Amino acid sequence: NKRNGVVAGRFESPVSLEGLAGPATERIWLGRSLGERVEWSFMEAGIEFRDEGPLPEDRGRFLIRSDVAVTRDAVTAFADAVGTTDARWEVGGRLGNFVADLSFGDDGPWLVYLAPGGPVTPERIAQAEPLTMDSKERLLEFPLSEDHHGASMVELPISDRLLMPTSHWLQLLWANLLGLGPFLWRNLMGSNILQVALRGAWAA
């Protein structure tokens, strides 16, 4: 369903791209360009996305940094949570810690909401207040060779609510790895992670 009174767009990243050709929006995420995937995420969440021109000041504005990957579920959760003041996305849990480790000191902002009224400015984007989101994560265990890695397994936090920068090639790689499972489950089974887990538990 379309959300009234809001619109989405991009703001440019101050972080230099590393390791792969740019621009960031043309790099590949989950089989298509990052720019296309991000636009779909907003549109699937019911939010009009405008790639060019200033956004209308009489609407609430969601602004995502040009190098950031975001899923529909992350957009939906953030849109449901924002109020009447400017806000910036933050996420807790293991996923938040994992993405923070991969950010190489880049703490954003990556996604902000600016309330209606007043222009979009870099200062306003930077001053948006943090809004901590529930990551709704699941931990998946992957076996390792204890002789080589010093541990028998590693736990990765997987969530439908993924949002992370991709300016560095390693970040883009992880964005594809972390996003692949939820992407495949949603597209092949028409379900989110929780529904898949419940379906599996019921079958057992």
Predicted regions located by residue number:
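Terminal amphipathic alpha-helical/low-complexity segments used for targeting or macromolecular assembly
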Residues: 1-203
